[in-house]
């Protein structure tokens, strides 16, 4: 359990370090960003399909946004401040297709993160995932919007 906590702390540190770099300055205005890292190759996970859903009043999930991670393993521009309203969201990463493209047979069909957004006022969210063929770990960085 202690090693998992240390791992998550290190992963959060990587996110903060990349946010502080020069490349993160313009992207800090993005209200929802996804970062995916490949733990096997020690590199960004490129071309991972990402789908975002929003929970409706009747409990079903409606498509909200989608895209693929870039060379950096990041996906920006999923939504705008105006559209990213209070609610419950689900981020789904197509991990099976990612590993299959690398010739690896994975255990999981996909990785998902379900979270409540903006219930304490408007915030920006970075969802980070560390993938391996038989496991995944996620963390989030929630911050105030940058002007």
From Swiss-Prot:
The gene is Ttr. The keyword Transmembrane helix does not apply. Pfam families: Transthyretin. It comes from the Eukaryota. L-thyroxine binds at residues 35, 74, 137. Homotetramer. Dimer of dimers. In the homotetramer, subunits assemble around a central channel that can accommodate two ligand molecules. Interacts with RBP4. It comes from Rattus norvegicus (Rat). One of its GO terms (biological process) is thyroid hormone metabolic process. The modification Sulfocysteine is found at residue 30. PANTHER family: TRANSTHYRETIN, URICASE AND TRANSTHYRETIN-RELATED. The keyword Glycoprotein applies. Coiled coil: none annotated. This is Transthyretin. Sulfonation of the reactive cysteine Cys-30 enhances the stability of the native conformation of TTR, avoiding misassembly of the protein leading to amyloid formation. Thyroid hormone-binding protein. Probably transports thyroxine from the bloodstream to the brain. Residues 1-20 form the signal peptide. The modification Phosphoserine is found at residue 72.
């Amino acid at each position: 359990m202690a090693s998992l906590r240390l791992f998550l702390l290190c992963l959060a540190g990587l996110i903060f370090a990349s946010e502080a770099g020069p490349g993160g300055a313009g992207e800090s205005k993005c209200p929802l960003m996804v970062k995916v890292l490949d733990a096997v190759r020690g590199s960004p996970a490129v071309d991972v399909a990402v789908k975002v859903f929003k929970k409706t009043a009747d409990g079903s999930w409606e498509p909200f946004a989608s895209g693929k991670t870039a060379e950096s393993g990041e996906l920006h521009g999923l939504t705008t401040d105006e559209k990213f309203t209070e609610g419950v969201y689900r981020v789904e990463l197509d991990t099976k297709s990612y590993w299959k493209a690398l010739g690896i047979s994975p255990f999981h069909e996909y990785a998902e993160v379900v979270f409540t957004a903006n219930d304490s006022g408007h915030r920006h969210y970075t969802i980070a995932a560390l993938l391996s063929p038989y496991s995944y770990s996620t963390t989030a960085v929630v911050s105030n919007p940058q002007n």
